[in-house]
Amino acid sequence: MTVRVGVIGTGAIGQDHIRRLECKLSGAKVTAVTDVNQDLARKVANTYAKQATVYANDRELIAARDVDAVLVASWGPAHEASVLAALEAGKRVFCEKPLATTADGCMRIVEAEMAHGKRLVQVGFMRRFDSGYLQLKQALEQELVGEPLMVRCIHRNVESAESYTTDMAITDTLIHEIDVLHWLLNDEYQHVRVLYPKKTKHALPHLQDPQLVLLETKKGVIIQAEIFVNCKYGYDIQCEIAGEEGVISLPDVPAVRLCSNGRKGTEVLQDWKKRFEAAYDVELQAFIDDGLKDEPASGPSAWDGYVAAVTADACVKAQESGREESIELPKKPAFYQHSAATPEQV
């Protein structure tokens, strides 16, 4: 059996997913593609998936009989409509973040999925599938350091694009930490405050960089998250969790250590693609496997997408107010209580 996938959006991430579906992963093939740029869609299909039909829009693709599952990798504001259409058609859907650009939009997807009666949505929070984060999760579940007390995270990029704005430090960058820490700690966020350190000379006039986000969970864990998107030296992701009995940290990315000319060191990655390439493979294979077995989606859920959106909204509000802001979430529906895969299952 093969899961026949229709891909909406053939930009950079869409192309990456088409390539991995066709060339790296098992149990799936790309049978349909669409993009607002039809010439690009045809070019991508001809390059990676010659058998795929190019459709004029997402609705035609979703309705196609040879599409079992939908992968949404289009412009963020278009995600909600595509996901809702896929749910209406009863087709499972993998949606790159954001699930929707508003918390209300995410809730509409949650409600539509619950009305359908089966988990069909997986959100593209790939860090949950990264081997390093899986090791952290396993260590926490085995209580190797006791109860978590504090978390320190770092998210650094070489430089930001001219279009990158201060709020995007939350909605585009910190959103990954928001989700993965919610999953790691199995705890809900309660309060947030955002601090602005001295601004780097490398940031454009409209951008505040770096930023420091302080999150507090309902269990009292304090999270210090640094976002520095013009650090210049490389792409650097770190996470350290201090518990009652010890400290655990995200392992370093394996790299050759070079000793030469009186210096010793390793290469620093320059972008996110290499850092999380394997995680992208694993998350999409999990989505395919769920489809092959006709089981509910086991990856990050629509509810997780909603939690991330509500938390991000509060963080942006804290950016603007300069004060501590509350993060208020309704009770998690029973529909989503026991749906996430454990590290052993992934």
Curated annotation (Swiss-Prot):
The entry's keywords: NAD, Oxidoreductase
GO BP: any one term: inositol catabolic process
Biased composition (Basic and acidic residues): 322-331
Complex formation: Homotetramer.
Broadest EC class assigned to this enzyme: oxidoreductase
Domain of life per record: Bacteria
Pathway, per record: Polyol metabolism; myo-inositol degradation into acetyl-CoA; acetyl-CoA from myo-inositol: step 1/7
Function noted in UniProt: Involved in the oxidation of myo-inositol (MI) and D-chiro-inositol (DCI) to 2-keto-myo-inositol (2KMI or 2-inosose) and 1-keto-D-chiro-inositol (1KDCI), respectively.
Catalytic activity reported: myo-inositol + NAD(+) = scyllo-inosose + NADH + H(+); 1D-chiro-inositol + NAD(+) = scyllo-inosine + NADH + H(+)
Pfam family, one: GFO_IDH_MocA_C
Location of the region described as Disordered in the Swiss-Prot/TrEMBL record: 322-346
NAD keyword on record: yes
GO molecular function, one term: inositol 2-dehydrogenase (NAD+) activity
Entry annotated with the keyword Oxidoreductase: yes
UniProt-recorded name of the protein: Inositol 2-dehydrogenase/D-chiro-inositol 3-dehydrogenase
UniProt record similarity statement: Belongs to the Gfo/Idh/MocA family.
EC number assigned by the record: 1.1.1.18, 1.1.1.369
